[in-house]
A protein has these predicted regions:
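A Zn2+-metalloprotease active-site environment signal
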Residues: 1-164
Length: 164
């Protein structure tokens, strides 16, 4: 697979924070999340088609918005689990590189700031991107608790230019 990072992140994140984001994305590749997600979507669609071919009330439900909602829930839950695993991968990626894993929480804080700046524009690319991701506050808290629990000191939050 390939990893893509928005170049604008380089303007707001330190090298360690960017490395954490890259580690997160590498985690998706290492865990074959795209392949597994595609397989889940195909199986869910096939199951839905199989039920609807039988006719009756079950078919009516699978063809309705309720069926679409069920399919979305299956895929969203899977996606949230993948995101947590990719977050953990990014955290470990930083540690293995000899970097401070607090960078995961700090990168999420900056992403949250970007999301807040996008505001109520539900159609913004950023809000669309994060609509399938776990809540950033929960992700920040989880990474902070992990680093604190491991006795890792939080670095001073430097401007990206000063950090390079």
């Amino acid at each position: 697979g390939s990893v893509r990072i928005f170049s604008s992140l380089m303007d707001i994140m330190s090298d360690e924070e960017l490395l954490g984001v890259i580690g997160h994305e590498v985690g998706h590749v290492a865990h074959k999340d795209s392949k597994n997600g595609f397989r889940t979507a195909l199986l869910t669609s096939a199951l839905k088609d199989g039920i609807s071919s039988q006719g009756g009330k079950a078919a009516a439900l699978t063809e309705s918005q309720l069926g679409d909602l069920g399919e979305a829930l299956v895929n969203a839950t899977y996606s949230q689990k993948q995101e947590r695993e990719a977050d953990d991968y990014g955290y470990e990626f930083l540690k293995k590189a000899g970097k401070n894993p607090w960078a995961m929480a700090l990168s999420f804080q900056k992403l949250k700031q970007l999301q807040e700046e996008a505001g109520a524009q539900k159609s913004s690319k950023l809000n669309q991107l994060f609509s399938t991701h776990p809540d950033l506050d929960a992700r920040i808290k989880r990474m902070e608790e992990r680093a604190t629990g491991e006795g890792i000191e939080k670095p001073e939050n430097k401007a990206p230019e000063a950090a390079r």
